[in-house]
Design a protein with these regions (language model features):
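Cross-family detector of peptidyl-prolyl cis-trans isomerase
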Residues: 2, 20-350
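N-terminal Sec-pathway targeting helices
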Residues: 3-7
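Bacterial N-terminal signal peptides
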Residues: 8-17
Length: 350
């Protein structure tokens, strides 16, 4: 075979090779040269590229990736998110009065569905809802994460500490912004780049292992936070009496007669405030409060303390979370697991 013919064959093979390669997609260009775990979400409006925080929120990312790749038991061997829709969208593009977020990942398509299990939150201080393009878990309260997620249009700081942030948009925020309710998630492709990312697997075994680790981590964090809170309460309200229920109280004005007890109609003046002295409610804002003691109308700790008071008595009381608003908190003002204080005065008893 002569040299000229060999040269022609080589040139032809090079041309075929070049011509046969599809150009790199815009989504892949956005993450070219970057290490990490990424999700390319093909939607009715175009592609959204998400970087997943697999080192900071390993359980949540394992859940998302494992469902997307069909490797978790709940996915039944099929890509879980492919073909689902964005069932809840609040944005100007959707015809709403404000921009908020797009939400998807529900196989029921109405906000009630999930993978058939729930898992705990993974809150990380540096991962917050700071602006557009934050990928976060939708939930129905503490420890109720499943498959639903949302992506923000704007900063939503009121969701910090309530929803787990586990990723961010690195390309395609314009697609997020024009997504409308009912638009499809056609396909989710997981891309791993770099040695660490390529070693990150998301099988059912991985999920189960990380679930145990997160539960233990959260348990220790809760214990430490509780210990610090008790120390702060006892320092702030030094000299208070502590009841067996864990309520702290100080009588600031003695009352008259017998203790009120249960099934009495009482009227009280009050001021409620957090441990940072932020007032969340006060009878100064409206009329004094009238209720029947032991009637299930009030939070337990407040009711217990008023029953123990006398007419015209004043107390400062500090209630533990389990006798106040618990894990859920209240009104977007009282955080979950918060100690709260009241200044209370009984002004009428029937």
């Amino acid at each position: 075979m002569n040299k000229k013919f060999i040269c022609i064959l080589l040139c032809a093979s090079i041309l075929i090779s070049i011509g046969g390669c599809s150009p790199m997609s815009e989504s892949m260009k956005a993450i070219e040269g970057k290490d990490g775990v990424f999700a390319i979400m093909e939607t009715s409006q175009g592609e959204i590229v998400l970087e997943l925080h697999y080192k900071q929120t390993p359980l949540t990312v394992t859940n998302f990736v494992g469902l997307a790749e069909g490797k978790l038991t709940a996915a039944k061997g099929k890509p879980f998110y492919d073909g689902l829709k964005f069932h809840r969208v609040i944005s100007k593009a959707n015809g709403d009065g404000q921009d908020f977020m797009i939400q998807g990942g529900d196989p029921a398509g109405n906000g009630t569905g999930g993978p058939g299990y729930k898992f705990p939150d993974e809150f990380v201080d540096e991962l917050r809802h700071t602006g557009p393009g934050i990928l976060s878990m939708a939930n129905a309260g503490p420890r109720t994460n499943g498959s639903q997620f949302f992506i923000t249009h704007v900063a939503t700081p009121w969701l910090d500490g309530k929803h787990t942030v586990f990723g961010k948009v690195v390309a395609g925020q314009d697609i997020v912004n024009k997504t409308k309710q009912g638009d499809l998630i056609k396909k989710v492709t997981i891309v791993r780049q770099g040695e660490d990312a390529k070693n990150f697997t998301a099988t059912q075994e991985d999920f189960d292992k990380r679930l145990v680790e997160v539960k233990e981590k959260n348990r220790k964090a809760k214990e430490e936070a509780f210990k610090k809170t008790i120390e702060m309460v006892e320092k702030k309200f030094a000299g208070s009496t502590k009841t067996p229920d864990g309520i702290y109280y100080t009588i600031t004005k003695e009352g008259n007669g017998e203790k009120i007890g249960g099934r009495k109609t009482v009227t009280v003046k009050y001021k409620g405030y957090l441990m940072n002295d932020q007032v969340f409610d006060s009878s100064d804002f409206h009329e004094p409060l009238t209720f029947i003691t032991a009637g299930g109308q009030m939070i337990p700790g407040f009711d217990i303390m008023v029953q123990d008071m006398k007419l015209n008595e004043k107390r400062t009381i500090v209630l533990p979370p389990d006798l106040a608003y618990g894990e859920a908190g209240a009104g977007g003002v009282i955080p979950g697991n918060a100690y709260i204080a009241f200044d209370v005065e009984v002004i009428k008893v029937k």
